Amino acid sequence: MRFTKHNLFLFFLVVVLVVSIEAHIGEYDEIWRKRAQQAKKAARHAYHPNPKIVANHLNNQVDKAIRGSNSRRRDLHRYSGKCMATNPIDQCWRCDPNWARNRMKLTDCVLGFGRKTTGGKGGKIYVVKDNSDKDLVNPKPGTLRHAVIQPEPLWIIFAKNMVIRLSEELIMTSNKTIDARGRQVHIAHGGGLMLQFIHNVIISNLHIHDVKAGSGGLIRDSVKHYGYRSKSDGDGISIFGSTNVWVDHVSMSNCQDGLIDAVEASTAITISNCHFTKHNEVNYLQIPSLKFPLETKSLIFVLKLLQVMLFGASDSSSGDSIMQITLAFNHFGQGLRQRMPRVRWGFVHAVNNDYTHWLMYAIGGSMHPTILSQGNRFIAPPNANAKEVTKRDYAPESVWKNWVWKSQGDLMMNGAFFVESGNPKHAFLKGPDMINSKPGSFVSSLTRFSGSLNCIEGKPC
């Protein structure tokens, strides 16, 4: 086959995509096969057959929170305005001065598709005292890696502010909460978090940034098992075949690959109150040494587009049809290029998020995903060619016009526009049982405290 610059680029882009959906498992042994089977069963159990019910419940809670905000503001006046919780998740816990004494109350607060997530509730408190990550096979007690591999439910907190540079990706086990409230904890300059074939995980109040691809090697993934891992991608949080996951009040930026990926039939996920920034650089991958025609010898790097969020990694992974994800009260801020998220196959409810900057587009997809966009604010960039919120890939209009992409109550600013598709009478938008979201004009308030919080124990947060 004679390579041209064009088909060479496409070839290596395909290679990149294939590599990105591998599990990074060097030896797919009986332990991993069993975990994968259990994960598929958990995903089927977590899938909600009527996602409209979940969307309605969240929208109803937002409405109640806003209708009660006036009385709450009067109450807060007595506290000199030191606490203002502007959405229902935050109102559930933030203004309680005793939140640190009852950390597990946080599990009562989750909304959306991840609403049944309880993390380490009912388990012991594990205090991380050591920010080192030197031994990947026998992690040191008191480190984050030692905490997340324990077999029992754990509520993981931190003794002090710390920066944790993970030597390789952090492979978690089920029934864990990583709760950094009250501390400034950064996962930075090393590996990211890997949730692979697990369930019931809460990640709260972390800073995750400057995550790098790992080299792989022998890594312990449970108390009783370790094995060889291949090179990791450099995602901040990778959700791979996992269910009942809640990511809340996390600040993320500048990871080598994606900020958050959810793939391989991951479902029952809520991402809320997060702040995403500075993820628009382009990575280049060096082409292996091959004999090319003369005209392609100078082409030694290929472009790898970065994604803020990738939900579904392959057009061939039809198992991602089970994917259901809620994005609520997040701020997609400065320095983001595209893919907020980029969706294949599954269902995404994006509600009351603030999209204040993008360079190419905000929401994209392929393989007929279902997208319900409600009450978001979209502020388009100055570039006249990047005003469209949406982008469909690898399908002509004759095909994508049947995909269900709906916008309701979104606020479009600076020329932004959302191209809808699908039946205009789709059940999402019709019927007496439909509860509308609060419109996009409420977003600046609902997302006001997105990102990691500066909480102090003994005081409202």
What spans do the regions from the language model cover?
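Extracellular beta-strand-rich solenoid/capping regions of secreted or surface-exposed proteins
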Residues: 140-152, 163-177, 187-204, 210-242
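Acidic Gly/Asp/Thr-rich repetitive segments characteristic of extracellular carbohydrate-active
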Residues: 107-156
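Extracellular beta-rich repeat passengers
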Residues: 27-97, 298, 342-461
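Acidic glycine-/aspartate-rich tracts in secreted/extracellular proteins
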Residues: 132-133, 161-162, 183-184
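Cleavable N-terminal signal peptides of Sec/SRP-targeted secreted and luminal proteins
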Residues: 5-23
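Right-handed parallel beta-helix
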Residues: 175, 180-183, 199-210, 225-226, ...
